[in-house]
């Protein structure tokens, strides 16, 4: 603004100077030009001055191209004929500031012209000048403002676009170790990419493929840290292959993955899509966790990841996948269920994603741990896919797998199982935190995650309905828990205890001890108790046991599961009994050990999925809703009570104030009455005296 004003003055001066002072300045007065307004105030004065003193405007007149008005501060009496008389308050128009004597200006006041001392006047900002300057400033200001506004308006749009692009991508880019890289990929994919991952399996896979390598690298590092002995790293490689290729058949482990890919095709629904994503990612469940993880995995899952890292990157990733699913509640439940399902096998994923997550992690670990497990899972996955077609066949296959790999799976399951427990806890929090509904669904996941075994049982629980038949049939034998099964759980415990320590999954280790505790270990702690625990699970107790894994919400959720899971409970008792007895880890691990029993269960679950998701979720949701509603009701009651108390206090205060005011009014009235009476009495007396 200042610059523009400064520039305008010289321009005006130049124009005035260029114009002949006599004519041109007066005629045009600068009004024709937008910049001239500053000169317009006194266009005629300069010409008069020039005519009186000079033929052409001298250079020093440039400083005063137009008369400036100064206010007189002090009176001045002229001592010479050419001096100007000044009176305080008068306005002097300065015609020239350059005269023969320094400190003297030439000006005009009240129609007289002369010189006067410059220290007798104060230059108030001339009104005439100010008006043009303001106009100019307004003109220039709008020009500048639009420029400023334009970038502002454009910036918000850009920011919004960036946020829009990054926001969806972030939400869908499961915050994984490589969040930045994922964000970049997600940005490229844009919100569409995020929706693709959630909505359609193939696009989701593509995205996850791009991101999974990063996650896998992180997860592979985690696995290496957790236990080099674990095959997870090896498994990861196949998983990477799987992630790189939607059809993960390339590797034997990928074969299950490839089957899972078909499942994605089969499963267009969000849950199935998730399942597909999970299965695709679950070629090694860890892969599914990783693949979905990148897209879906939320930060909470990441939190679980540390545990998972300790246990197995894969586990954490599966959990992440679950978590990812959780972020999108609708798909989350399904995806979580699916994720868990994959643990048991792909079947579990689809049928019982909720339960599967834990199972998934455990199986994933097992897969990572042993190719056999992966093969079993592959077959299991195939069974799972087929399970929709025939759960019995899947169960048989699973049983055969379990029988074959019971020892190896037990060992491996122990390792994977331990990790699942930690993830479960974190997931449990995440699931519960994220949403009651998810909680209901996730609680099973959480329970499963909390304790691999628990998760297994949870998976089995999802299976329960399908398993109910098979498990019920197998329940007696399983509940009997042949010495072999019990021994295997014990062995599994030992292995888990050993592997878990390796995994450094203290949480799992804890669970292992819990195995004694079996987070549910409450009963699970001992396999001997496991049968009891399983029975409780079959009953509500088993649920509660699982609930411990999940937490309270998980218990409630598990209870619904158990309601459904009673079958699973039987199976769990049968399969999980040893596994749960082992502890959550044992269960997950046992499931892997009996991997397949759980897998069969999970396969059954595939059939159950529809039942489980509804009944199971409904039960969980009901339990969660009831507890949450109770809490809300209590909080509301408290709030109402507080409000009532506060209102009462306020009312009492108001009443007191009213009473005090009434009393004051009465007093004032009394005083007024008394005063009036007193005043009247003297008047009467005075009147009487006057009359006399």
From Swiss-Prot:
Domain of life according to the entry: Eukaryota
Key words of the record: Coiled coil, SH3 domain
Pfam short name (any one): SH3_2
Coiled-coil parts of chain: 628-678
Keyword Coiled coil: yes
Domain (SH3): residue spans on this chain: 65-126
TM helices/strands, residue ranges: none
InterPro entries reported in the protein's UniProt record: SH3-like_dom_sf, SH3_domain, SH3D21_SH3, STAM
Stored PROSITE patterns: SH3
Residues of the signal peptide: none
Biased composition (Basic and acidic residues): 177-186, 378-396, 490-501, 542-582
Keyword Coiled coil: yes
Ranges of Polar residues composition bias in the record: 210-220, 673-692
Region of interest called Disordered, as start-end residue ranges on this chain: 1-60, 132-501, 536-605, 672-692
Protein name: SH3 domain-containing protein 21
Species for this entry: Macaca fascicularis
């Amino acid at each position: 603004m200042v610059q523009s004003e400064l520039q305008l003055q010289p321009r005006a001066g130049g124009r005035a100077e260029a114009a002949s002072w006599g004519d041109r300045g007066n005629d045009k007065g600068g009004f024709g030009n937008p910049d001239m307004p500053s000169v317009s105030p006194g266009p005629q004065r300069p010409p008069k001055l020039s005519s009186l003193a000079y033929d052409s405007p001298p250079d020093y007149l440039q400083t005063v191209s137009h008369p400036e008005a100064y206010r007189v501060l002090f009176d001045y009496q002229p001592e010479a004929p050419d001096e100007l008389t000044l009176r305080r308050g008068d306005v002097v128009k300065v015609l020239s500031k350059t005269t023969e004597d320094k400190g003297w200006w030439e000006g005009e006041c009240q129609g007289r012209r002369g010189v006067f001392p410059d220290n007798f006047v104060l230059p108030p900002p001339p009104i005439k000048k100010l008006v043009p300057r303001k106009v100019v400033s307004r003109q220039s200001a709008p020009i500048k403002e639009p420029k400023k506004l334009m970038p502002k308006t454009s910036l918000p749009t850009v920011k919004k676009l960036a946020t829009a692009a990054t926001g969806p991508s972030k939400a869908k880019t499961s915050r994984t170790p490589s969040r930045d890289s994922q964000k970049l990929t997600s940005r490229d994919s844009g919100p569409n990419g995020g929706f693709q991952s959630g909505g359609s399996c193939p696009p989701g896979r593509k995205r996850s493929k791009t991101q999974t390598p990063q996650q896998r690298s992180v997860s592979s590092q985690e696995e290496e840290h957790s236990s080099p002995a674990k095959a997870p790293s090896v498994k990861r490689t196949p998983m990477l292959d799987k992630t790189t290729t939607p059809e993960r058949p390339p590797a034997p482990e990928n074969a299950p993955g490839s089957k899972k890919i078909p499942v994605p095709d089969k499963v267009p629904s969000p849950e199935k899509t998730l399942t597909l994503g999970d299965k695709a990612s679950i070629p090694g469940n860890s892969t599914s966790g990783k693949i979905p993880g990148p897209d879906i995995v939320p930060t909470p899952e990441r939190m679980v990841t540390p545990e998972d890292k300790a246990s197995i990157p894969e586990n954490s990733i599966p959990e992440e996948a679950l978590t990812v699913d959780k972020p999108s509640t609708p798909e989350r439940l399904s995806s979580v269920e699916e994720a868990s399902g994959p643990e048991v096998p792909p079947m579990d994923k689809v049928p019982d994603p909720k339960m599967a997550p834990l199972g998934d992690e455990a199986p994933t670990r097992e897969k990572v741990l042993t190719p056999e497990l992966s093969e079993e899972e592959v077959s299991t996955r195939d069974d799972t896919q087929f399970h929709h077609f025939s759960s019995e066949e899947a169960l048989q296959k699973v049983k055969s797998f379990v029988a074959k790999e019971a020892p190896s799976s037990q060992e491996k399951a122990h390792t994977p199982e331990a990790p699942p427990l930690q993830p479960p806890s974190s997931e449990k929090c995440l699931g519960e935190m994220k949403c009651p509904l998810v909680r209901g669904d996730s609680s099973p996941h959480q329970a499963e995650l909390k304790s691999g075994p628990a998760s297994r049982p949870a998976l089995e629980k999802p299976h329960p309905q399908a398993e109910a038949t098979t498990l019920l049939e197998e329940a007696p034998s399983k509940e009997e828990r042949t010495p072999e099964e019990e021994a295997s759980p014990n062995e599994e415990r030992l292995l888990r205890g050993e592997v878990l320590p390796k995994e450094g999954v203290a949480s799992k280790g804890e669970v292992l001890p819990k195995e004694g505790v079996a987070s549910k270990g409450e009963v699970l702690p001992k396999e001997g108790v496991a049968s009891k625990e399983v029975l409780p699970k079959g009953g509500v107790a088993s649920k509660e046991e699982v609930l411990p894994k999940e937490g309270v919400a998980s218990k409630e959720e598990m209870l619904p599961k158990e309601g459904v899971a009673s079958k699973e409970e039987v199976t769990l008792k049968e399969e999980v009994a040893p596994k749960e007895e082992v502890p959550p880890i044992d269960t997950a691990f046992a499931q892997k050990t009996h991997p397949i029993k759980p897998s069969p269960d999970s396969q059954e679950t595939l059939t159950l999925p529809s039942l489980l998701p509804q009944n199971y979720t409904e039960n969980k949701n009901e339990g969660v809703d009831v507890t949450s509603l109770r809490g809300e009701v209590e909080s509301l009651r408290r709030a109402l009570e507080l409000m009532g108390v506060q209102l009462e206090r306020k009312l009492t205060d108001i009443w007191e104030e009213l009473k005090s005011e009434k009393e004051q009014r009465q007093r004032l009235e009394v005083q007024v009455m008394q005063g009036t009476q007193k005043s009247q009495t003297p008047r009467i007396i005075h009147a009487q005296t006057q009359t006399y």
